């Protein structure tokens, strides 16, 4: 839980996750007539420990919703598309937009089409063939003569842009997890799965690239079960394989579906299943029912009685189990070959939740008690919305907002909770990639955007006349792992600072600080590509050429043994001087840093103890060994001394800083380096060479998987050893090798590296002197 709370909005340190989860959902009971009033009921009870308890709360809220709100929610789905890099997310999304009539022609990602995919609207995205920013759109899908409205967000697959996935999943109700039929579950698939679990996102799974040589959907499903530890079963089997892929058989109702037409836009249904697939269909159907019986009580009862469940019973069980996050139905096809995408849209309608089937909570910060509140997905309730994404547009800052409660009208006012300022909604739009369509109002469960609002990503907005001040929690923000110095080549006219401020506002994982010692601006982020993209954006969007330093690893400093300290700070230079004495102990701690005190007899007054805490925080920013942040230190002050004239807050802050340094150096200090999870894929003939390369950089191989044509090596390597790795990998695989890396943990670096880093730091300090 503490890991999540690190990303909490600054509204309140006690803010909890807004999404219903094991972290905290409280039962609020409200009468229907109170929906139009500005005050919601706050009958708070225990945290639901199971989905059944959570469902009781949802059902209670829905029983009191007006029919109009139920109907609008029934036709709405907020979904994201997530996957490992190059699994075909953007290609899949392009087909969704085409088949829903949102676009009139299909365009491909870089390398196949001069235009570029609709959702990759940045020039950099189209040039590099990757998604950098999550892009939002909306479209409509007709199923059973009913029109359904989708708010759809396409997310990046590269780990460097993981915050885009975090912010999208934070506001979505369901997702499509795209898995490659050849490579199966890969490193970033595992990361995306972890992010979906963090926000309790139900998902349907689409096995893509079924037209590729070596595709094996059932191996991929097995990996979903084993690696993601998510019960999964196919609800389709493919008709044909690889280049002969023609369609799929829906095993629930035993109907063959063929994609026809020049772009697969026509679906031909046939109850006559190909003869060679009948046994496979029955086998996979039996496996589906067996898997559902493990996760759904109603199907379990039918299964144990030896009866065959009906089509309606199977579909209802899949929906219940999927929304309860106990199961994921698996579909298959090929987005590039225009096969199977429409079936996924049907599955989104059938199996993913509508907004009123998800429990969202906020925290009422209008009182000191900070009561937790269940949000009501009704347009009649007071407005509550979360700003989850910012972009700089031609009309100023564009703010994406998810409406959780109430409605937002063009021309109306809302309050920015953090600042208390009243904000006018002068323009309200729905986004389609980088295009927009004006709307007059949006209701509960919708996603929209507005202009001219000064806020940060993760801020909450409430209705102007709301009595409650409901704060939504923000998304989880991971720590930066790499830094570099940056400076404009030419004299800065203010654009450099403007760009830095804007990028920080847009992206919480992009950090900027000024190092007073080196007099350099330091930018930090999630990887080399992450920072490289921002340097390139500076040039394109602001016309600023920048000089960058060598990438620096974000090391951490830690202690490995307990120690005590007794430190006195004395300074006399005429007049009142400075005096403070602090006594205590310091010991290693797993994870976060901690400051504590237990002073008997008032030897150190309360105001000076607060200064000690600030001195501790200051000391953590720059460790005594190499000037990097300190991790896992617990400082406890249990005694001290003051002077009637010379003691001050500054004295005790300085004394704590000195005591920290003294104790730290006596506590067997070590330097920690980031260890990355690395996944390398290459043709089989290069396996020996790649394994040798991993061993050469000191990596630890965790797993090797051999496919028909390619192999995959998963290893743990220090980030320091990964600089230049892409060049080495290209050289030893004739340009055919690929790799991804993701931060895993901090670990103690080798003694020789520690000595080298300390020597370099001391030399740097001597040069400055």
Curated annotation (Swiss-Prot):
GO MF term set: GTP binding; GTPase activity; translation elongation factor activity
Subcellular location(s) per record: Mitochondrion
GO BP annotations listed: mitochondrial translational elongation
Binding-site positions, GTP: 83-90, 154-158, 208-211
Major localization class: mitochondrion
Short name of any one Pfam family annotated for the protein: EFG_C
Pathway: Protein biosynthesis; polypeptide chain elongation
Similarity comment: Belongs to the TRAFAC class translation factor GTPase superfamily. Classic translation factor GTPase family. EF-G/EF-2 subfamily.
Record-given protein name: Elongation factor G, mitochondrial
Organism expressing this protein natively: Debaryomyces hansenii (strain ATCC 36239 / CBS 767 / BCRC 21394 / JCM 1990 / NBRC 0083 / IGC 2968)
Primary gene name: MEF1
